[in-house]
């Protein structure tokens, strides 16, 4: 050990509590020290002579502390006094017997007799333990001292009893005083101003019952811990042979290279453990005393450690078990032959310095990582974290509970635990705490569950807002109907598993859960919107039943071949290339002849409640008159089944027309011939983007978006052009109750690309990312609904029809104070079509105005639709102003 006062290395065989070597290593080391001591110790001195010569000696290096008087004890006296003092003070307090020198195996006699050579024989190995059976009483004495800190009173209580009279019978006044001072040294450990305490320590393999010194207050660098005292006694060759037993009590012996002698180190400081990166060092406070000095700042609760020496625990401390060796993977923690070498945390060749701040960070990281069991994800940005927290909190229950401000627009959404949507999920912030601290780049968002989150939030908002909206059974009163282009993120197309079985499997799709919820809720869909949950959708059978019940509807909604929802389960139909039959188109749009006229007349007829959006494909070769819904049918049976361009995987993936029954009650007939209703039930437009390896054919569509003011049902007419190779689906998102086909446009303000992306879902099958695709042309109540959808889409990077999205089909006519959102087109869309420029959108009633857009690109599975929206922008804005 390197002492400040000695300025030379001292070989420390010190009292490392629990850090001793195995017996053979200690024996070898002690032998080496003994031999070196024999060679260097002067032979003409005995213990008594040294004791008398240094009784009043002072060290010139550092002044003596008032708490550290020169001991003036011989090595034998120091061993006896230390054993008795620890038995009186420490053992009762700690509850076990600390290490002992056990030199009192000899008869208890004064040092005068012990110094005689004839008394060194081991003839009477009688251990003097006067305090057996008094542990509780002695512990109470220590506890009282911690309160009143009365040294004399505590000493009297500790030494009361018959044993003390016998013990001090052969002691002179000086020896009694030395013993008393030594007990005081141990008692001062429990003073409130000591700044440290002694605690049990079982870390080290060589000791079962060890102890350690822990700071109780903050110590600054170069502070002296004066009460942490070490008492030193020089050892002669005879005393070494007499007192030390290899591997038993030679744990606290140092060799001074300056004095060329072995020294016994006892006292409270003997309980300081070794560390290869210590925070303290020993400094001399007198000829035979020392204390501890802080090498760096020490925080409360941090163990006080010193450096014993380079070879104290074997050669190069190869058997050291300190915390630093554990962290660095050295010493006893170094990998052995055949074991993989642990990578050092910071102790690499070109690593960072082991500063206190870095080590504290590592320590905190380790603690937090233990606490965080399932931190599956973390957001890539702070905005993500905030938004995820909002969404997760709103997901706690599927009942009404609208989450209020989730305006942060993040590109990706952190994944939530994969549990049913109804199950409670902790907010991401909580997850982060649990999860410690996983680097952001290591966090992988789980794709499918985002749509679930999005879906449930949307349903809740719709459910709550439906109460505030005026939705009557006889006639649908729609306040401020607005078509919202919901701007979304770039969409990656991935190959989607075919078949109903894959719906639940792909990308962790929640198809089964959606079906389960549908079974519970679809019965409620027939009720008026005020009663029904927004997250319901109907099956083909229920569609027939409802249509039969609603005789007022002029349009027959024939079951779509693609309508594969039976009992809430998606059944994809094989891709037969079937197109909507003329019957269907006629039934869907009995008054389609007036559709285009209606679209033109809409701004004029608009009663400031509806917005007219006219979107036309750049190459318009065939305008679809497949706009559904006769205004007369009071039941949303007018929910035309738009023939949406469904996702057309080259293999038998479902696509085609889907009949969407509308649970909208008694819509008022549109004088223009096209009733426009802002359906709360726009179905979750999750359209499947199967990223098939086969070459895809791009289908061109003619599109027209019409808003009629009479019934408030927005209508989008999509028709396949003659030159296109795919089939078309008319999309009408008017079905309040449940429409399985929807177009949702979402705008992500954080997205770099300013292109529209729309997803069309024919409601037939759920794709791999089914939970994530919720983009549609929808009437948007809240800006908040935008965030999760866009993010869910982007995060999954997969566009697929989502059964969960259908759950949102039955949305009550809510307060659509929605603004039209532009969505960014996906350059990664399989069509490979170029991204369009800044896309507009109006309808930011009280939200951020969006940049103007010239074209709108709807990406439907493998197909895309280009809609010219620049020509209608001014009219739309004027309509909005009028509204």
UniProtKB/Swiss-Prot annotation:
This is Histone-lysine N-methyltransferase KMT5B. The gene is Kmt5b. Residues 194-309 form the SET domain. It comes from Mus musculus. Residues 613-623 have a biased composition (Basic residues). Its EC number is 2.1.1.362, 2.1.1.361. Residues 1-67, 364-442, 613-750, 810-848 are annotated as: Disordered. It is found in: Nucleus; Chromosome. The lineage of its organism: Eukaryota, Metazoa, Chordata, Craniata, Vertebrata. S-adenosyl-L-methionine binds at residues 99, 204-207, 211, 258, 273-274, 321.
